[in-house]
Amino acid sequence: MDFASLIERQRIRLLLALLFGACGTLAFSPYDVWPAAIISLMGLQALTFNRRPLQSAAIGFCWGFGLFGSGINWVYVSIATFGGMPGPVNIFLVVLLAAYLSLYTGLFAGVLSRLWPKTTWLRVAIATPALWQVTEFLRGWVLTGFPWLQFGYSQIDGPLKGLAPLMGVEAINFLLMMVSGLLALALVKRNWRPLVVAVVLFALPFPLRYIQWFTPQPEKTIQVSMVQGDIPQSLKWDEGQLLNTLKIYYNATAPLMGKSSLIIWPESAITDLEINQQPFLKALDGELRDKGSSLVTGIVDARLNKQNRYDTYNTIITLGKGAPYSYESADRYNKNHLVPFGEFVPLESILRPLAPFFDLPMSSFSRGPYIQPPLSANGIELTAAICYEIILAEQVRDNFRPDTDYLLTISNDAWFGKSIGPWQHFQMARMRALELARPLLRSTNNGITAVIGPQGEIQAMIPQFAREVLTTNVTPTTGLTPYARTGNWPLWVLTALFGFAAVLMSLRQRRK
């Protein structure tokens, strides 16, 4: 049996789809093999050529299952370690999540073959990127969204990175789909013309990486210190551990006062309600102000609402140089985009009694506003995002201000142990710095704590799973990238034009 007849078998295509999907995981950190993104997407498109809509949908689903099954299996670490459920149930939940996310790639492939069944330039160069943009938007929006493993992030060190400050990471997704589709067409049709067009399209954005959209402000360079406490997740919310945790962070911070202008503690570094820690916070605030330093820390806050109930927030507060700390101070940030099951539980009256996984510590948070003013610490303006929020490009951009000196993200990835999850999270954070041309300060409990430059480059970092302090000089920048000015609107206009053209041309072809 020759290869041509073998590849026509649907079962073979489904198996290959799984493999091509799994290959895509190599494009992301910590592997960082960016060509794997093109190979994976090329395989997806080639396998759906000359297939009926349901066959294509199955191929798209299997491809997605290969990608998400291999790329987000780190979720298993937190479920198995802290979920309190039998092993088979843990595996089932991870499989269920991967299968759910694969519905979107299945939808993409099925609709593509339904509306544009012919293997043509129209399908791969116009219809495919527009439809992919829509289905990826749905994946990042429905049920609060999970926009993880978008292939644009693979280009943070790749040839297309220069497109990010211009139109954002989603524009890189768009171009990767177009290029990979043309390569698939060239391979299947054995035609050099799509290959030439693909190479030209891929090369066009390369010079953009040499455009500097920002102006450094060396006169405002400061020393920043980020304390990585490395508190085990199993002990983090243990009441008996609270005093020891505060000692760890304070002892690491005391020598930095008067030396570092800005000191940063990670997400919920203070594992207690803010109102309970007023004596500690006020004493620390006074000491910081006396020595001319400021501190930014994660903490938990609970406020009485109009219904006479408490709203609990995942919060960032500032202490030190400037106005004295006050519990009523507006210089704070409350996390807006909460993670299901980790920070709130849907249908909690039903799910919480079922297993510890649905009743984790601090899983009843309330949302802060979508738009919040920047934090101000020691005269430094910080656009903040807590943990998962840093992967939400449009939300970070909407909170960004022209006078922002730095992007700030604090996180606690201890939930995911030594898996690849924290590295993928770190890669996405780097893209925010590139899109908005600002240095990014990333402070975490156990890694990856780092300073990212305004071009997405790693300027300084410390190892994971170590109780260390990262101290370095950081220079703020000024200036607005095109993406900072417009967000995703230009890409959505382009998507609408491509979609309209694809539908119109398809209708004309069917009438002939």
Curated annotation (Swiss-Prot):
This is Apolipoprotein N-acyltransferase. Catalyzes the phospholipid dependent N-acylation of the N-terminal cysteine of apolipoprotein, the last step in lipoprotein maturation. Residues 227-476 form the CN hydrolase domain. The gene is lnt. GO terms for molecular function: N-acyltransferase activity. InterPro entries: Apolipo_AcylTrfase, C-N_Hydrolase, C-N_Hydrolase_sf, LNT_N. Keywords: Acyltransferase, Cell inner membrane, Cell membrane, Membrane, Transferase, Transmembrane, Transmembrane helix. It comes from the Bacteria.
